[in-house]
Amino acid sequence: VEPRVVRVELGKATGIMPQSEQIPGEYYGVGRRIKVYIKDIEREGRGPQLILSRGNEEFVHYLFSQEVPEMETGAVEIKKIAREAGRRTKLAVSSVLPGVDPVGTFVGGHGTRVQAVMNEIGEQEKVDIIPYEDNPADFIANAMSPAEVLSVTVDEEAKRATVYVSEDQQSVAIGRAGQNVRLASRLTGYELDIEAKAAAKSETKPRKNIEDSLMNAVEEVAE
């Protein structure tokens, strides 16, 4: 381990993990066994050098492929991933088989599958698994999880959408330092604007006094 760089000797090849490919806050001690994703191979005079990563989206894809055997059979698949390593990952999944719940398949019984992935990347990194939708408005609404969305209007030409939420959901939709809406935007490919809608005030009619109602009824009968 060198300052800001993790270096791994692999026979004739050398693997390095730059700081940009590391999970923020993660400590790599000498002799520690870790899983990595081979992001690139650079050819040098001394031989090939492997660029390793634990902080990119492909690493999360690899980890789920180890935990979800249905990915190998093609029953379920990861459509898109957006990640800010060490903080949050959003995963859009789908199924090609009717009756198969893709989200439940990736979460696993009692959350065992997603928990195994979180154990590797660090439990401080939240993982949102959402169903992929071909309809952009539906997909955007799903991507805004955990916020509850009222409606979405999409401008296909501008690749922009407005997401309407109730006032109490606005901060959830935006997320800490804009993280939730930022990841949702990357996941869906649309620039997203969050608009809060005030709760509609119900028009309540004044309750009539029961004695007045009885008197009115008596008067009508008398007439």
PLM region spans:
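RNA-contacting regions in translation and RNA-metabolism proteins
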Residues: 1-223
